[in-house]
Amino acid sequence: MPIVKVRENEPFDVALRRFKRSCEKAGILSEVRRREHYEKPTTVRKRAKAAAQKRHAKKLARENARRVRLY
């Protein structure tokens, strides 16, 4: 859990903004959304595999685009 110490004469809005930013960097909200409902292990693996395939296709597309532009 991110900890934000309120500085002397610091407005509440500024401290709240710093806290929100630190929570975002820590990935707390995305973790809460991910754990909101139970997801079967097979579904987790299937989603991870699909994401890996998408990353690989994106990488290949970038490499092919780079090769075309060189000459």
Curated annotation (Swiss-Prot):
Record's keyword annotation contains Ribonucleoprotein: yes
One record GO biological process: translation
InterPro entries reported in the protein's UniProt record: Ribosomal_bS21, Ribosomal_bS21_CS, Ribosomal_bS21_sf
Basic and acidic residues compositional bias, start-end: 60-71
Keyword annotations of the record: Ribonucleoprotein, Ribosomal protein
Domain of life: Bacteria
Compositionally biased intervals (Basic residues): 43-59
Annotated GO CC locations: ribonucleoprotein complex; ribosome
Molecular function per GO: structural constituent of ribosome
Renumbered residue ranges of the record's region Disordered: 39-71
Keyword Acyltransferase carried by entry: no
Family from the record: Belongs to the bacterial ribosomal protein bS21 family.
Name of the protein described by the UniProt record: Small ribosomal subunit protein bS21
Organism name: Vibrio atlanticus (strain LGP32) (Vibrio splendidus (strain Mel32))
Gene name of the record: rpsU
